[in-house]
Amino acid sequence: MAQETFSDRLRQTMSDRDVRQSDVIRASEMLGKKLGKSQMSQYVSGKTIPRRDVAELLARILEVDVTWLLAGDADQGEA
């Protein structure tokens, strides 16, 4: 089996939690952070990997460990 990528883990987590890209964007705004539609789409599609601060924001919103989200190295448990 091929190794999972950041986008694989992001998509799977969003699917498991029934969260859409627009939900993540809205949640980021509620936390006082700006996350654009294009930016989010690029993360989900695997075109780009977020900076650490953005990955921490995504992990917080999705309630997963940031290390796992970025590298797959930690448990998927709550952040």
Model-derived regions, located:
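Short, charged recognition helix plus adjacent turn
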Residues: A2, D18, R60, L70-A79
